[in-house]
Amino acid sequence: TTAEGMPVSWCLAHPKVGEREVMTALLERDHHLVRSGQVILADKGFAGREFEAFLTERLGVHLVRPDRKDEPARHGRLARVRQWIEAVFDTLKGQLSLEQHGGRTPAGVFARTGQRLLALAAGIWHNWTIGAKIKRSLIAYDH
């Protein structure tokens, strides 16, 4: 997502596929959505030399993630950033009922997940358009 929580790219993946592999596939497919010099915020699960090399060398982006205990401090405490990222997930799960999608087939899950992401994007876009102070707030649309 963008800083305001606008969905940029997404996919559904088998739960046994690692986060780094999924993110690599998304970025290879949607490489035109990132620009050299951009920062990607992620959690500790994205630690890995090969993945970070892909981001830096192939895409020219910088990965910022919490430091693992076995590595030197690089970016300091990122608790506020983590809270900010989790707030986007909370919006999807809470207000948009992402976890109670009701899809019974892979196609149904895909369609209903897409509906929720589109609803979030429409709300953020509308808030941008009207100049709302908080772009990700969906309270005005929560009927």
What is the predicted role of each segment?
Residues 35-108:
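Helix-centered, glycine/charged polyanion-binding patches within enzymatic domains
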